[in-house]
């Protein structure tokens, strides 16, 4: 009988679904910090601890956990899906921040995947094997995470562009030059309209393709990075930078990005659904795929938007459609599947942040043909 570990159920791609039935193992009450080692810059936690709660509890130490998916995500699910968030362009994804796991195997054996030291060449990389395995190899009951130092200076800036291609091209050049931005996000004019209609940010936004930047580090370093990014965005037809003057303004400016999905969901009417999925491509192909996908989405004649973590070539499409209308649903499905096929043709991947969902099955099979996923299915692990 399949045993499905469940920590928060916040996945947007239904990763906790049980298509073949089974038993749910609920970790709801395992939500504590087991041990905090400030000098070692690591923390031991249970799987149902929310990452934002973790950061609230340790902020007085000057440390934080930098992986930032949706606010409701919990550490167990983050490990299972090898998730990421807006900070990935600087800090990487979940797999870079997991030191050790306590895992219960199918036969009841309890193992630890690694000792605490950050570097080790002894044996297989078992931690890396379990991160992203979605509970298929064992049930994770305890996690040791690396922590980072809270940057001395953090600020946020927002800049608009006339087209989504201009914004994507600017993002690709910023990464190619090597500017260490803290985060770099993109939202199209439809998504900016959604945020305005939801009215949850306390600000009225220009309804144009928009990029959101975080800059963090030393004061001098932040100013240098801002100067370089400003010149690049200007060269790609970017408008004026809207800078945060203080922490309150930074929170307001960044809120549009964090509220993006929930703003779209708030527009749902009876019978409507939001279909959202993501892809990633090499940075050099990002402007092409975003431009083509945007046109095809607009041709649907539905409420459809693009947002994404363009610093690592990753973006999402979200479409609001009538689920009771078979023709409308079929058109949306074709549009999103075409986007995924296009990404695969560009040497990209069919899913990035949330692992492969039921909607990715056909594309995942294509992806498997040319990667090690086929071997993974046949492997003894």
Sequence positions of predicted segments:
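Short beta-alpha connecting loops at secondary-structure transitions
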Residues: 38-41, 157, 274, 324-327, ...
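Short, ordered loop/turn segments at secondary-structure junctions
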Residues: 7-10, 70, 116, 186-189, ...
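Short, acidic (Asp/Glu-rich) active-site segment that either coordinates a divalent metal cofactor
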Residues: 12-16, 23-27, 136-144, 219-229, ...
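Activity-critical C-terminal alpha-helical subdomain
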Residues: 109, 356-381
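C-terminal substrate-recognition/cap domain of FAD-linked oxidoreductases
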Residues: 149, 158-160, 168-338, 342, ...
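FAD-binding subdomain of flavoenzyme oxidoreductases
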Residues: 32-185
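Glycine-rich N-terminal segment of FAD-binding domains in flavoprotein oxidoreductases
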Residues: 1-30, 47, 309-310, 343, ...
């Amino acid at each position: 009988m399949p045993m499905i570990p469940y920590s928060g159920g916040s996945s947007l791609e239904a990763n906790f679904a049980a298509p073949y039935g089974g038993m749910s193992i609920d970790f709801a009450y395992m939500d504590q910090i087991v041990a905090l080692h400030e000098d070692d810059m690591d923390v031991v936690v249970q799987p149902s601890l929310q990452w934002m709660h973790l950061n609230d509890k340790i902020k007085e130490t000057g440390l934080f956990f930098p992986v930032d998916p949706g606010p409701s995500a919990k550490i167990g699910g983050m490990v299972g899906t090898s998730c990421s968030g807006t900070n990935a362009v600087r800090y990487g994804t979940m797999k870079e921040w997991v030191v050790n796991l306590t895992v219960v195997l199918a036969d009841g054996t309890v193992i630890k995947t690694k000792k605490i030291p950050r570097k080790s060449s002894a044996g297989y990389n078992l931690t890396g094997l379990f991160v992203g395995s979605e509970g298929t190899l064992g049930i994770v009951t305890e996690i040791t995470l690396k922590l980072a130092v809270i940057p001395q200076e953090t600020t946020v800036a927002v800049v608009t562009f006339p087209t989504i291609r201009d914004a994507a091209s600017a993002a690709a050049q910023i990464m190619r030059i090597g500017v260490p931005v803290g985060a770099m996000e993109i939202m199209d004019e439809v998504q900016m309209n959604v945020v305005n209609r939801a009215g949850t940010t306390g600000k009225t936004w220009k309804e144009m393709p928009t990029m959101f930047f975080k800059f963090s580090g030393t004061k001098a370093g932040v100013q240098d990075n801002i100067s370089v990014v400003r010149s690049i965005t200007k060269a790609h037809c970017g408008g004026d930078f809207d800078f945060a003057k203080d922490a309150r303004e930074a929170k307001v400016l960044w809120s549009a990005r964090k509220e993006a999905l929930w703003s779209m969901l708030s527009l749902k009417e009876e019978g409507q659904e939001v279909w959202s999925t993501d892809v990633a491509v090499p940075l050099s192909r990002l402007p092409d795929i975003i431009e083509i996908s945007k046109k095809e989405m607009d041709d649907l004649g539905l409420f459809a938007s693009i947002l994404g973590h363009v610093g690592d070539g990753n973006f999402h499409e979200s479409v609001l459609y009538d689920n009771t209308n078979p023709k409308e649903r079929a058109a949306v499905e074709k549009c999103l599947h075409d986007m995924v096929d296009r990404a695969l043709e560009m040497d990209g991947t069919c899913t990035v942040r949330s692992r492969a969902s039921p909607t990715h099955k056909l594309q995942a099979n294509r992806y498997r043909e040319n990667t090690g996923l086929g071997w993974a299915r046949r492997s003894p692990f």
